């Protein structure tokens, strides 16, 4: 897979862009995030689908808004029947394309997390 790029998708929890020096925050130094931003792809016009973390993460994971994927609060993880319901996550799509995928850290979108 040497001809494919590595993909690292960071899901920060409650991190505002005005608290990052790469976006102009002068009161804080964030060199590691700045390096990732400089060498990767930044989405300057990206907006969260939900102000609540679990629905927002599920929306990113599924490509569907909270109403369509069925996760509208922090009390539910991803639907246990999501595959039977025809929902495919982008990590699954990457895995199907031959990528090794992994989820590390606090996610709260799987019921066993």
Predicted feature descriptions by range:
Residues 1-113:
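Formylglycine-dependent sulfatase
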